[in-house]
Regions:
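Beta-alpha junction/loop-to-helix N-cap segments that form part of ligand/metal-binding clefts
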Residues: 64, 79-84, 98-169, 236-244, ...
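Non-transmembrane, solvent-exposed beta-strand/loop segments in proteins
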Residues: 444-487, 491-674, 678-679, 701-708, ...
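Hydrophobic alpha-helical transmembrane segments of membrane proteins
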Residues: 650-777
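Segments of small-molecule ligand-sensing domains
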Residues: 345-354, 367-431
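Solvent-exposed, acidic/polar segments of extracytosolic/periplasmic ligand-binding ectodomains
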Residues: 398-467, 474
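Periplasmic-binding protein-like
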Residues: 127-141, 159-161, 201-207, 257-275, ...
Length: 777
């Protein structure tokens, strides 16, 4: 039985000094671990911010490269001038977003020549005095020719995608043309009118300027009469004081001519508009043809103020033919993507000027990348010369640039090579590909010319042969999409396919290039008839199609379902499939609503958009033909591609797949409130959460096919793994502090861990919300 100590009597042990563990030399352990933890957090934050800042500094520390553009932003050519500027700016913006050229951002100086010669010459001196390394523009020959000598004397590289004056490049070795010459365009137009359209008489109405109207008229007349046709020429005065008088004379002459033939307008669109209105209002309905200046939908829209046009769309322009370097309904996917981007950026449909000056900017940037530049005021002349040399070296497809519509390069005279001349026809206010095109035969030795000419498939103009290329207006109307199989990378589609064309019996001989199984027989259309001179075929097609799914953004992903076909018998020179914009009613806003109906069976996906593109399939095999052994053979077959963009419904997916992970985030965070006296329990909960999340990640990956990259959702799991690991390391550090009785340091460390945890989670959520802000539907 123990005896209680008497009051006032000290126990012997209380007199002994309390023994503490020996203190370590240096900084107290608790403070050391706390500082180490803070230092680790700072290193992570500073490393992230520093890396981002360095990358930004590297892209902005170098002086910007300066380019200039001279275009018409006011005056009669303001519309195409604005288009050209927007096309250039669109490409330069994309280059700057990607880091610029060799670390240099690109600045664009914009000069408005107002479609006025005197202003253009002043602009030329301003451009030369600026730090611009090269210039894009001018828009047309009437402005370019008078200022050409100024640019030549300054050795300033100039790239134009629209100036056609024949002599401008020969008079200036620093001028580079990405387009056709006046002679090429007018001569080809004459051949088309005579050989394809079958006209034997032509009335040439031209503006009396020496830079464009007169040489265009002369070239057309020379070729047309050389083929055996007859012409009459009628001049329209550019001088406003004389213009109405000459216009009245033109109308009077044509009104009293019973056989005016085709009326060829050798002039820019502003003058062509005046002539067309005068002719149509006086009842002259003869077919007309023009150069490329009026060749766009915007030209038809420019008549909207007239009552005749409002009551009957296309009243003035229906039946008008025009040449063009680019027709969007027969353009490849790259051009269609550009058109979509342009419309999203500027809210309007682009004409050919926008696309061609986008390509001019591509060539300019390629020259900047290859040139050796010091980019100082003292080196400006040498830098300009270096860029000119790089442009001059682009004399082959390999040395050139891959543009929107094919390779971009120059001949030795600095003229663009292989620039196509297409012909369009206005119909109900739209500029569409004409039913027959002319395609030059690049290697006549590989073609049985006599046989093909006898069959009416080719025509001869001098020493040049041309294929008569049939245009097939094609469209796909989606009826239903079902069974998107992620594992097999396929989807099932049910749709209608139609074609409208002249002549060619082989137009419907197609194969679906990405079909795994399809029910289609070209010999059994649902409907077969001839309408307005065009053969019309309608097919009902069902099948399974292969897809190339991209899961980098999973589950915030957008996928593209592609249905494409190609002709299996005729090459692309003989037949081309174009987008039937009228049949597809692409201009109507109800098109998207109709397309959404096809996806009603897909509960996990939402329809976003549909894009059509004329496509080309290339075969580089010689097929054992000895004539092809020593050639760079490339046989191309035309086709059409329909690309449907769909988007995963993110919110339902996140609710069903991430709810468990969210609970684990909360569980680990809740464990931080466990008393530091029970750090072992905290470790157990964290390890359990870590292992559970690993199992969840395996379940997510099992839903995807075998892919060799990390998807977006996986990064959330990886971040959670890192947080768990951080919590475990800190818990062990805090346990060590407890051993030394550093309670204050433990509390501070725990508070900091709370802050870091919440900060990481908040930053991750914000980042995903910002990056995928348009995907949460």
């Amino acid at each position: 039985m123990s005896q209680e100590p008497e009051p006032g009597v000290l126990h012997a042990q209380s007199l002994l000094p309390r023994v503490h563990p020996p203190a370590r030399r240096g900084r107290p352990p608790g403070r050391r671990y706390l500082l180490l933890f803070i230092l680790l957090a700072l290193v992570l934050v500073v490393g992230f911010v520093g890396t981002y800042s360095v990358s930004k500094l590297q892209s902005t520390s170098k002086a910007a490269y300066t380019l200039a553009i001279s275009t018409s932003l006011s005056g009669s050519q303001a519309a195409p001038g604005q288009e050209a500027l927007q096309g250039v700016q669109l490409y330069l913006d994309s280059v700057n977003r990607a880091g610029g050229v060799n670390g240099h951002t690109l600045d664009l100086l914009v000069f408005n020549d107002k479609d006025d010669v005197a202003t253009a010459q002043k602009v030329a001196h301003q451009v030369i005095a600026s730090p611009a390394l090269l210039m894009l523009g001018p828009l047309y020959s009437g402005i370019a020719v008078p200022s050409n000598q100024i640019y030549r004397n300054a050795h300033l590289p100039v790239i134009s995608a629209s100036v056609s004056n024949d002599a401008i490049t020969s008079n200036n070795p620093f001028f580079f043309r990405l387009g056709t010459t006046t002679t090429q365009e007018a001569s080809t137009s004459a051949t088309y009118a005579f050989q394809i359209l079958g006209f034997r008489n032509a009335s040439i109405v031209y503006t009396d300027d020496a830079t464009y109207g007169m040489p265009t008229a002369q070239s057309f007349a020379s070729t047309f009469t050389g083929d055996g046709g007859t012409v009459q020429t009628l001049a329209l005065a550019q001088n406003p004081a004389q213009r109405q008088k000459t216009l009245d004379a033109i109308v009077n002459t044509l009104a009293h001519n019973p056989k005016p033939g085709i009326i060829f307008l050798a002039m820019l669109d502003t003058y062509a508009r005046q002539v067309i209105v005068a002719l149509r209002q006086h009842g002259i309905i003869a077919p007309m043809m023009s150069t490329d200046s009026p060749g766009s939908d915007s030209f038809a829209a420019s008549f909207s103020s007239y009552p005749e046009e409002r009551s009957q769309p296309g009243y003035f322009t229906d039946g008008l033919y025009a040449s063009s370097p680019l027709l969007y309904d027969s353009a490849p996917a790259a051009v269609q993507n550009f058109s979509t981007l342009y419309q999203q950026t500027y809210g309007k449909v682009p004409g050919w000027h926008a696309a061609k000056y986008y390509e001019a900017a591509q060539v300019a940037v390629a020259a900047l990348q290859a040139a050796t530049l010091k980019n100082t005021s003292a080196s400006l002349s040498d830098d300009r010369m270096s860029i000119a040399e790089q442009l001059g070296s682009m004399t082959s497809p390999q040395a050139g640039v891959v543009g929107l519509d094919g390779p971009l390069y120059f001949d030795n005279a600095h003229n663009g090579v292989a620039i196509p001349i297409r012909f369009g026809q206005f119909s109900h206010g739209q500029f569409l590909s004409a039913p027959i095109q002319m395609v030059s035969i690049s290697n006549p030795a590989l073609v049985n010319l006599a046989s093909e000419e006898h069959a009416g498939n080719i025509i001869q103009v001098g020493k040049q042969y041309y294929w008569k290329q049939s245009v097939v207006y094609a469209g796909i109307d989606l009826k239903e999409v079902s069974n998107i199989n992620v594992t097999d990378s396929t989807f099932t589609a049910d749709f209608y396919l139609w074609m409208r064309y002249i002549g060619s019996a082989n137009a419907t001989n197609i194969s679906f290039t990405n079909a795994s199984s399809v029910m289609f027989d070209p010999s059994t259309p649902v409907t077969s008839q001839t309408i307005n001179g065009l053969q019309y075929r309608l097919y009902h097609v069902t099948g399974d199609f292969k897809a190339d799914y991209d899961y980098h953004d999973y589950p915030f992903d957008q996928q593209q379902l592609i249905i494409s076909f190609q002709n299996t018998l005729l090459t692309g020179d003989q037949l081309v499939y174009v987008i039937d914009t009228q049949g597809l009613q692409l201009e109507q806003h109800t098109t998207m609503d109709d397309a959404k109906v096809a996806f009603q069976l897909l509960s996990s996906w939402t329809y976003r958009s549909t894009q059509y593109a004329s496509d080309t399939f290339t075969n580089r095999s010689t097929l054992g033909n000895p004539l092809l052994f020593n050639t760079q053979v490339r046989t191309e077959y035309s086709g059409l591609e329909m690309t449907i963009t769909i988007q995963r419904k993110v919110i339902p997916y996140l609710i069903s797949h991430l709810l468990a992970l969210v609970l684990l985030f909360l569980l680990v965070y809740a464990s931080l409130f466990i008393s530091t006296k029970h750090l072992g329990d905290r470790l157990v909960l964290t390890v359990t959460a870590l292992l559970t999340s690993a199992v969840l990640l395996l379940a997510v990956n099992s839903e995807l096919p075998a892919i060799g990259y990390v998807v977006s959702l996986s990064y959330i799991y990886y971040i959670f793994f890192a947080i768990c690991l951080l919590c475990m390391i800190v818990a062990l550090m805090m346990e060590k502090m407890e051993e030394y009785g550093k309670d204050t340091a433990v509390r501070r460390t725990n508070i900091i861990l709370h802050i870091i945890y919440l900060t990481i989670v908040t930053v991750v959520v914000i980042c995903y919300m910002v990056i995928y802000s348009n995907r949460f539907i």
